[in-house]
A protein has these predicted regions:
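Hydrophobic/aromatic residues within transmembrane alpha-helices
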Residues: 124-125, 228
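N-terminal organellar transit peptides
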Residues: 1-111, 115-117, 130-133, 147-289
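Hydrophobic/aromatic ligand-binding patch that stacks against planar heteroaromatic rings
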Residues: 123-124, 154
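Zinc-dependent metallopeptidase catalytic helix centered on the HExxH motif
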Residues: 128-144
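Short acidic active-site motifs
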Residues: 120
Length: 289
């Protein structure tokens, strides 16, 4: 037994030290990542940048901030807007679209569909100088949807009743405790149709398509990349390398130097994502998907 203790004693001490000083070691690791020497080739000023839109669009604050920063950065000569998103909420999608529109007036922007560029994420991309899509990607779904649930049957079985005091005929619109009334559906449809008109008109203007023929490219059609090109929703098929090469040509840079995301920022984003909590209301969201 004493022999085993002597053999494993150094290992036990090491593990005990790591356990007692984990936070300090993590802090030192973060300091090293922040101040570690930069390779010589990274000391050159970046002249191109990739901005990514991935996942459902629920909030555009960080992405729009990133786009605005690049817009004002004179050292960045062109932007690759990489998209893989099924769409999302209307207002954030519009915010991103108009941020890209402002950016494209100052420097070339290539939007690249790596997997899905549909609904709100397609809206976000329409003002890019060119849209390149992976041959296996899905494009389109230009439409608007609002949906909710009717829990009245379950509530009745559980003996739950809703009590409401309201001012305004439409104030209870979208409630989940009873079927929606015809006048409520009509009111919601008014909003949906107006939003769809805005969406399809912006697409027509940005892509130079005939708005009167919007049923051919909108109407929530889902297209392959090749089909999307035929109806005018994208410019070319290609992989990410293709999109980057086109951006290099449009930006006029002699040597492409891509701006890499800071290592510390990557770590903090992962930590934030793992601890994020999402709150939702019962009111049915208006989404582009």
């Amino acid at each position: 037994m004493e022999l085993l203790k002597k053999i494993f004693s150094p290992l036990a001490k090491t593990l005990n030290y790591i356990q007692n000083h984990f936070k300090a070691m993590l802090f030192l690791l973060l300091l090293f990542l922040l101040f570690a020497p930069t390779p010589k080739d990274e000391l050159n000023t970046p002249n191109l940048q990739e901005i990514k839109l991935t996942g459902a669009i629920m909030d555009a604050t960080d992405l729009v901030k990133q786009i605005n920063q690049v817009t004002q950065d004179n050292t960045i000569k062109g932007v690759l807007f990489s998209v893989d998103s099924p769409g999302g909420a209307v207002a954030p999608s519009v915010e991103i679209a108009y941020a890209i529109k402002r950016l494209s007036k100052i420097k070339p922007v290539i939007a690249y569909a790596s997997g899905t560029m549909a609904s709100g994420s397609y809206y976000a991309s329409i003002w890019a100088d060119k849209i390149i899509a992976n041959p296996g990607s899905m494009i389109g779904s230009i439409g608007v949807i609002m949906q909710g649930s009717d829990f009245s049957g379950i509530m009745q079985k559980l003996g739950i009743k809703t009590q409401v005091v309201k001012a305004g005929k439409y104030k209870q619109i979208g409630t989940p405790d009873r079927p929606w009334k015809n006048y409520e559906v009509k009111e919601l449809n008014k909003v949906i149709q107006a939003t769809y008109d805005m969406f399809s008109r912006d697409v027509a203007n940005a892509r130079k398509l005939d708005y009167k023929k919007r049923d051919t490219f909108a109407n929530a059609h889902i297209f392959t990349a090749l089909q999307a090109k035929k109806v005018g929703l994208i410019d070319n098929l290609g992989v990410k390398y293709t999109a980057k090469e086109i951006l290099v040509q449009l930006s006029g840079v002699k040597e492409a130097r891509w701006n890499q995301e800071d290592t510390f920022d990557k770590i903090m984003k992962k930590i934030s994502a793992s601890t994020a909590i999402v709150f939702q209301t019962y009111f049915p969201p208006l989404t582009l998907r």
